[in-house]
UniProtKB/Swiss-Prot annotation:
<keyword id="KW-0949">S-adenosyl-L-methionine</keyword>
<dbReference type="GO" id="GO:0004076">
    <property type="term" value="F:biotin synthase activity"/>
</dbReference>
<keyword id="KW-0479">Metal-binding</keyword>
<feature type="binding site">
    <location>
        <position position="65"/>
    </location>
    <ligand>
        <name>[4Fe-4S] cluster</name>
    </ligand>
</feature>
<dbReference type="InterPro" id="IPR007197">
    <property type="entry name" value="rSAM"/>
</dbReference>
<keyword id="KW-0093">Biotin biosynthesis</keyword>
<dbReference type="InterPro" id="IPR013785">
    <property type="entry name" value="Aldolase_TIM"/>
</dbReference>
<comment type="function">
    <text>Catalyzes the conversion of dethiobiotin (DTB) to biotin by the insertion of a sulfur atom into dethiobiotin via a radical-based mechanism.</text>
</comment>
<dbReference type="Pfam" id="PF04055">
    <property type="entry name" value="Radical_SAM"/>
</dbReference>
<keyword id="KW-0001">2Fe-2S</keyword>
<keyword id="KW-0411">Iron-sulfur</keyword>
<dbReference type="InterPro" id="IPR010722">
    <property type="entry name" value="BATS_dom"/>
</dbReference>
<keyword id="KW-0408">Iron</keyword>
<feature type="region of interest" description="Disordered">
    <location>
        <begin position="383"/>
        <end position="427"/>
    </location>
</feature>
<protein>
    <recommendedName>
        <fullName>Biotin synthase</fullName>
        <ecNumber>2.8.1.6</ecNumber>
    </recommendedName>
</protein>
<dbReference type="GO" id="GO:0051537">
    <property type="term" value="F:2 iron, 2 sulfur cluster binding"/>
</dbReference>
<comment type="subunit">
    <text>Homodimer.</text>
</comment>
Length: 427
């Protein structure tokens, strides 16, 4: 296909596709799917080889969130039967993190539900970061605490945080359809505060809320303009007890097209396969490794993930290798840009995801049972499919009608182990 040849050439030069080209990727047929994966795989290997970065989530505070994000199992009014607990002590969080590190994770993502941290919360998390770093030499720590107030990003950076995650979730145009308690602009501002403080920014999306192809392209191009170092891609976990419980809009093929499109738009950025991969990609997960260069190991915030050893076996069987602790995740040009300051960018590459380098930071873009690391601690995606307080199943006018995937509620399991419990974690 001429389209794919063009996209590969652009990706190898760190040049973004046009919006029309990105839309065309999402519109490819199932017969063309393996060609799409192969093309995006060339771009992935150019910048990341066959390495896969492992990240590990620690849910510091679960449930009881005052925000009304429709996709999130921790939202205000959620009837999902998830674990609910207040802040873990620093030593408890450090023990949980150690399990992930022992399993091969080079980054620990600390997540807390809520609109955003108080100054006291930042002090608490700072102590947790220090405890984790003291026990695990060389480990990266990403914080995901919601909307930040002035000075909080600087304090987290001073405590040793390497990165901060806050997902855009969806396009600005449709953001009001998924939450009413904060705005798209609030999210953008928090990512920019993290960047200004010298933290590696992580910001991504959620697919599967009934969005159109245009919606997906809009949010990915917005992310490119925002220029995070890591872009986590979540797939909605339709948790019973949330407004989107009936939204089973994804197929494995659709998920692969979305991941390929993100890779073409953000060729040299850490693209992370985040929450919902087990539910929607299922046996097609190994193919996704040709598109992404980062995954979460083990469980998510409020939902169970694939067994940690199964993740490791999948990576090896697909011919990839776990990225070592001493390896810089992102290409040299992006790493050099980050070390030179957040504003350092390569003018030849344009702005956005293809230009400014990451310290290797990934981000917490995984949903904890239904959402990402946004204020609600779930997976940060947008959903034009339903307004924040509507019943599940109400469609937003103009949303693309995608062939629905089968409702695999058997694959959605609440996390009952690890952080906040007495049971050993999955890592």
């Amino acid at each position: 296909m001429d389209l794919l040849n063009t996209l590969v050439d652009k990706g190898l030069r760190r040049e973004p596709p046009t919006r029309e080209e990105a839309l065309a990727v999402l519109a490819t047929s199932d017969d063309e799917l393996l060609d799409v994966v192969a093309a995006a795989g060339k771009v992935r290997r150019q910048w990341f080889g066959r390495r896969v970065k492992l990240n590990y989530l620690v849910n510091l505070k679960s449930g009881l969130c005052p925000e009304d994000c429709s996709y999130c199992s921790q939202r205000l009014g959620s009837k999902a039967g998830i674990l609910k607990y207040t802040w873990l002590k620093p030593e408890e969080a450090s023990r949980a993190a150690a399990a992930g590190v022992a399993g091969g994770a080079k980054r620990v993502c600390l997540v807390a539900s809520g609109r955003g941290p108080t100054d006291r919360d930042v002090d608490r998390v700072s102590k947790t970061i220090e405890a984790i770093k003291e026990e695990n030499e060389g480990i990266e720590v990403c914080a995901c605490l919601g909307l930040l107030s002035d000075g909080q990003a600087d304090r987290l950076r001073s405590a040793g945080a390497d990165a901060y995650n806050h997902n855009l979730n969806t396009s600005e145009e449709t953001y009001g359809a998924i939450t009413t308690t904060h705005t798209y602009a609030d999210r953008v501002e928090t990512v920019q505060q993290a960047q200004a403080a010298g933290l590696s920014a992580c910001s991504g999306l959620i697919a599967g809320m009934g969005e159109s192809d245009k919606d997906l392209v809009d949010v990915v191009f917005a992310l490119r303009d925002l220029d995070p170092d890591s872009v986590p891609v979540n797939f909605l976990i339709p948790f019973e007890g949330t407004p989107l419980a009936k939204e089973w809009n994804l197929t494995p093929q659709r998920c692969l097209r979305i991941l390929a499109m993100v890779r073409f738009v953000c060729p040299d950025v850490e693209v992370r396969l985040a929450g919902g991969r087990e539910v929607h990609l299922r046996s097609m997960q190994p193919l996704a490794l040709h598109l992404v260069n980062s995954i979460f190991l083990g469980d998510y915030l409020t939902s169970e993930g694939q067994a940690g050893q199964t993740d490791l076996d999948m990576i090896a069987d697909a011919g990839f290798e776990v990225e070592g602790a001493g390896t810089t995740t992102l290409p040299r040009h992006r790493a050099d840009a980050l070390s030179g300051g957040c504003g350092t960018r390569d003018a030849t590459a344009g702005s956005g995801c293809g230009s400014h380098e990451d310290s290797g930071a990934g981000g917490c873009g995984s949903h904890g049972g239904g959402a990402g690391c946004g204020p609600c601690g779930g997976h940060g995606e947008r959903e034009p499919v339903a307004v924040a307080d509507s019943a599940a199943g109400e469609s937003v006018p103009g949303a693309r009608t995608e062939t629905s995937g089968a409702a695999r509620t058997d694959l959605v399991a609440v996390r009952r182990r690890g952080a906040g419990t007495d049971l050993a974690p999955n890592a």
